[in-house]
Amino acid sequence: MKETPKQYIKRILGNLSGQHPLRVQAATPKKLERLVRKLTPSRMRRRPAKGKWSIAEILAHLADTELVGGYRVRTILSKNGTPIQAFDQDDWARDGQYARRDPKRSLATFRTLREANLALLKSLSAKKWSNYGMHAERGKETIRRVVEMFAGHDLNHLRQIEAQAKRKRG
């Protein structure tokens, strides 16, 4: 059974466990690089189970969602209260051919987008962090909440990649 938006929020925010979201986001690219540094592209394309994403697919997903996160923040900054469109990650994975993407290129794209997004976030006034958008599935989300969600999302996928990277061949 697919989780509800409320369950998703609770699970993703639960990953933070009191960690500062900007610090989590700043640390993620280096953690990803460390985890995949010694893995071959073919190893990164191996799915851990039917219906589960490979490391390569997760890296492509992270790159695309970083683009989404940056767009959401910029849209909210330019028009407080703006609608925020949801997206189906599985549709994006299939139609964006995540399984065929070069994992190293996905990681480089993620890193570049993350650096740009962090530079913007660090420049915001305290007041701007309260600007919000209306997410199509989750309702009102401030920039602060968007950043927390993306940091929790990072931690979720870091755990998945770490588990797959440690798994023996077979």
Located regions from the model:
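Amphipathic, non-membrane alpha-helical segments in soluble helical-bundle scaffolds
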Residues: 18-29, 52, 56-59, 103-107, ...
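Acidic/histidine-rich alpha-helical segments that form the ligand environment
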Residues: 23-35, 93-130, 150
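Short, contiguous alpha-helical
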Residues: 2-11, 45-91, 115-119, 130-170
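Extreme N-terminal tail/first-helix region
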Residues: 1-26
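A short secondary-structure junction motif
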Residues: 35, 39-42, 80, 124-127, ...
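A short, mixed-charge helix-start or loop-turn motif at secondary-structure junctions
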Residues: 11-18, 96-103, 139-143
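A glycine-rich, hydrophobic loop/mini-helix early in the fold
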Residues: 26-53
